[in-house]
């Protein structure tokens, strides 16, 4: 049942490796330190079954930790052994999975040993306020000097009926900083000594951003 758990990691960047056939494969490097079970939720007490995982344990004197974190958080972490984590993520699991773990348990990349495919969830890179040509791939207007518009969206309405633009149409707006999940990425290598995982292809986020790694649904590892 521990296969239902997700791990919190950090995107370290990308690199190239050679596969068994001699092909050069682009891989994303994810570092995963020990994840701590910070809270257990059950259907009887919370309405659903879930496991809250914590990562990036704070290494600082006790007095410093008391100044930086609220008493509510310190009391929350005290129930799981007192290790304060900077990142908390919740994973919805089955009732059997909740019963198979305990508060304060630590998990690492060993739960992905032998897994062939994983799903990576993270926050995509922010690109600021963008126009419709960059965000949606609009063609734009004529490029000649006499044109009145070059990168505008153009007309998005109709005639006198309905006499308005329907809500939800494509407009210039903020781009990026979205929660993105890339599914079914191939696991190239799991290095337990260095606590890193190599997955084929790109994953969302910038270098140093937090990602969540979980076993792909419907794929046997």
UniProtKB/Swiss-Prot annotation:
GO terms for cellular component: cytosolic large ribosomal subunit. The keyword Ribosomal protein applies. GO terms for biological process: translation. GO terms for molecular function: rRNA binding; structural constituent of ribosome. Keywords: Ribonucleoprotein, Ribosomal protein, RNA-binding, rRNA-binding. InterPro entries: Ribosomal_uL3, Ribosomal_uL3_bac/org-type, Transl_B-barrel_sf. PANTHER family: 50S RIBOSOMAL PROTEIN L3 (PTHR11229), LARGE RIBOSOMAL SUBUNIT PROTEIN UL3C (PTHR11229:SF16). Belongs to the universal ribosomal protein uL3 family. This is Large ribosomal subunit protein uL3. The lineage of its organism: Bacteria, Pseudomonadati, Chlamydiota, Chlamydiia, Chlamydiales.
């Amino acid at each position: 049942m521990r296969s239902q758990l997700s791990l919190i990691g950090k995107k370290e960047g990308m690199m190239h490796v050679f596969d068994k056939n001699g092909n050069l494969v682009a891989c994303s490097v994810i570092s995963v330190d020990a994840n701590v079970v910070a809270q257990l939720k059950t259907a009887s007490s919370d309405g659903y079954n879930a496991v809250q995982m914590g990562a990036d344990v704070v290494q600082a004197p006790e007095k410093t930790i008391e100044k930086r974190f609220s008493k509510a958080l310190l009391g929350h972490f005290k129930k799981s052994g007192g290790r304060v984590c900077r990142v908390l993520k919740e994973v919805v699991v089955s009732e059997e999975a909740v019963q198979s773990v305990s508060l304060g348990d630590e998990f690492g990349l060993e739960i992905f040993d032998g897994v062939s495919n994983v799903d990576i969830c993270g926050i995509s890179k922010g690109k600021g306020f963008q126009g419709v040509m960059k965000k949606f791939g609009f063609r734009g207007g004529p490029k000649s000097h006499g044109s009145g518009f070059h990168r505008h969206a153009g007309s998005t309405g109709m005639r006198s009926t309905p006499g308005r633009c329907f809500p939800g149409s494509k407009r210039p707006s903020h781009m990026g900083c979205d929660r993105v999940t890339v599914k079914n990425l191939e696991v190239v290598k799991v290095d337990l000594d260095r606590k890193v995982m190599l997955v084929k292809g790109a994953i969302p986020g910038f270098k140093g951003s937090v990602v969540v790694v979980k076993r792909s649904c419907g794929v046997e590892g």
